[in-house]
Amino acid sequence: NKTILKALIDAGADVNAKDDRGRTALMRACLLGQDRCVEVLLDAGAKINDQDEVGRSALMEACIAFKRDTIHLLLERNADVNLFDNNGVTALMRAAYGGYPSLVEKLLAYGADKDMTDKQGRVALDYVREHNRAQLEPILR
């Protein structure tokens, strides 16, 4: 709830505090698509590109959950589209894996590098092929 969140911040809550897995309130809000809370947290100084213990960022969490509005909000606030997790997986690879053409196109428009490789040497196009997402092949070629 936006009102409660603002009250906590006004009372001195650390917007960049992390849980036992290194996740921040911003990451959780993005995973849940709580855009008003995302805005409040960012306005209060939440670090948009923080990563948890497995290397996931707020943008990656939003991509995993396919929260379109949240993704757009993060991109407009200059989230790094080319961050990668501990396995080298990027937001673009997650979008490709999920089979989300509009998300793949949006990430590319915001500068996602389709040639980045994960730790296994795979690029986003490999995720498309491995998971039978043929509709994405023309976008990523």
Predicted feature locations:
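Ankyrin repeat A-helix N-terminal signature
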Residues: N1, R28-Q34, E61-K67, R94-Y100, ...
